[in-house]
Amino acid sequence: MKGIFEKLKRRIDILLYKLGIRPLSIETLKELKESRKEREVLEFYDVYMEPEEFVDIEKYEFILYEGDIVGKTAESLSKIFKGNLFPSRNELRYMGVKDEVAYFKKVVIYMIITFLALLFMGLLDNNLLQGFVNGLIGAGIILVLSLFYPKIRLILFKGEIKLQILFTLIYMISILRAGASLPEVLESISKSREYGVVAFEAKSIIRDVNIGGYNLVEALERAKMRTRIPILKKLYDQMIVGYNKGNLPLLLGKLYEDIVRESMVKLDSSKFMIQNLGNLAFGVGLILPFTGMILSTMIGNQGFSGILSTINLLLLKIGPLLTLIFGIFVKLKIE
């Protein structure tokens, strides 16, 4: 009986590994190694040789690697949606994601969890078919949302990127005026996480110079072609011109002033629009529906419970949703 349970546990571990949910444990890998040895049958004319002992158990992971369902599915999804519909690899790295396959691997795992959860809920309600349909719909919603999530996050991330670039410009101007060269400044920025996206870009530029064999101007041109952030393109333009012609601190100072001035102008021009939209949104979205529902409740003689239901709907559902949408709009307009 103990052997049956051990085999069942091993099969469950292998299934979870194939689904990409958890890695194989050292014990399971050792068991796979031993079972593989047992299956090797010697012919009578073979010369017996002691099997090679691997110190690193992880070398046996190739036995099951080909069956990684989640990995293959994620790879297929990344090939389908890669391009204009989906952010570039660099933009994903800004978000802390290694690449498209790693992102879609997480998406597939969430889809599987959602499907199984809704299927289980349908099973509890004695309606397996409805649970299966709900699971498919839920997994589909997760997939659709996953396509738009990175771009929405990058749009909301614009203001933080602008602040990171402004702090980087202040640092670069002060260090360059102190006598440091541009390669030394980029090396220093790449070692500090405080500069966020700019630190990542500086690492890419240094890698192009040290490993790719490009000179600094060519590496800056490549970085300019890779990025989709307009402010970074302006920064690279100024760095290229300043490195070739000289007086880089002055050019970076002008860029800093332009970014701040543009942000202030945008903020001033958006004040009137944000104020009017706020009055319209909360007036039409909250006050008018609240008044109408209260009147209909009183006319329909629904009593105090009807008034509480109306307040619950407006304050706990419509209100927070409206506030979230308005907050996103304000953030986009300001940044």
Swiss-Prot record:
Keyword NADP attached: no
In terms of one coarse class, where is the protein primarily found? membrane
One Pfam family, short name: T2SSF
Keyword line: Cell membrane, Membrane, Transmembrane, Transmembrane helix
Q: Which cellular component terms (GO) are annotated to the entry? A: plasma membrane
Concerning InterPro entries, the annotation shows:
ArlJ-like, T2SS_GspF_dom
Question: Record's superkingdom?
Answer: Archaea
Q: State what protein this is by name.
A: Uncharacterized protein MJ0780
Q: Which organism is it from?
A: Methanocaldococcus jannaschii (strain ATCC 43067 / DSM 2661 / JAL-1 / JCM 10045 / NBRC 100440)
